[in-house]
Swiss-Prot record:
Residue positions of the active site: 148 (proton donor/acceptor)
GO terms, biological process: acetate metabolic process; acetyl-CoA biosynthetic process
Protein name: Acetate kinase
Gene (UniProt): ackA
Source organism: Treponema pallidum (strain Nichols)
Pfam family, one: Acetate_kinase
The record's free-text note on cofactor binding: Mg(2+). Can also accept Mn(2+).
Residue positions binding ATP: 14, 208-212, 283-285
Amino acid sequence: MIILTLNCGSSSVKYQVYNWTERAVIAVGVVERVTQAGSVITHEVHGRENHVRESPCPTHTEAVQLIISTLTDAHVGVISDMSLIKAVGHRVLHAADRFVKSVVVTPDVLETFRSVQDLGPLHNPANIRGIEAAQAVIPSVPHCAIMDTAWHQTMPEASFMYAVPRQWYEEYAVRRYGFHGTSFLYTAKRASVILKKRAEDTNIIIAHIGNGASMCCVKNGVSFDTSMGITPLEGLIMGTRCGDCDPALAFYIMRKTGMSVSDIDTTLNKQSGLLGITGKYVDRRDVCAAMKNGDALARLAFDMEVHRIRKYFGAYVAALGKQPDALVFTAGVGEMCCDVRAAACAGLEHLGIRLDARKNELARTRNAETEISTDDSPVRILVIPTDEELVMTEDTYALMQGTYDVHTRFTYSFQDPTYVNKARAAGLKRDLEKNPALATIVVPRLDT
């Protein structure tokens, strides 16, 4: 059974094709510059050279058509006919508090997404266009929506409410929603397996650090608090987003410069964060390289980012009311940047967080779950490569089968202690050939 997952942005459509019967990813790719000149698809199949082709995509419909034609192409495709695709899963950023779990897309569901798109103006319109485009191109199969906000619907009111007039919540749905929920769900469930705990007994703090970044306090296996707010702008310092700042800053700059609300929105979302501090860098690799070459602003950006992460670590230890079982790093930077991890954990020994420098240096792989804490650290420090697409695929499959439920009453395949990601296992084998010492930090240990 073939399941297609789509992640539609304003100018891109990312996709993955999963063979559920074989439990294997058979293709991934992205169409970039959608709605712009020079639209191009990059199609990746393990064991083959990447296929790159330009093709006009004035709308998301043409982008989905391009994906389907590529998947079924006699030379570069992976399926013989579109009819082999039995369902499509769609990532949806913002569903407010309307859904606590993934759903099959119906006209009423789409209307709900439209009704809350003001809460996610940078993402939701594109998500909706992507769903409509895919339904037009592949009309005969179920389409399912997997929402970033659903995971966080377990937060208590004291965590999600803002100290603003209650009327704003009641009339305009102003509250903390949180994002990266699919990633947090996956890493929380995998952490429980690694820790050999039941999900409902697991208390951890997760740092999802990519270009977008947020943290989640997981108490008794569910989201208890998170750093992003009504939009993804709040919280950690990100590639182009400012994260936490005094709201009056916007009013001050508007009075001083005459900037509009739209100008401020664009600046705080797309011209701030690491880019705003350094004036030129968004990628952490560039920041770290420049910092090591003496760039003072790159050093400042790095120090500000990790200071913010440490503050949230401390806050969430307090919110848990107990020592966490583990700190978990995930997403591109969290999985690969040992400098950020080391600095984020520095000075937290009094909280029971003890990083092993050698292990941390070794942990640069997306093909294995690793442990980078010292052997005597009261709090374990884990690096768990996220797999949002697998959650999307599994939710979609379970919805088709009628077996799906909210995550506290549903068991995922990756919660099985014997679960193996075939592609990552093959990648780990190659990694170990290059660096045998990696076996000493993989969990469970491979050198014993």
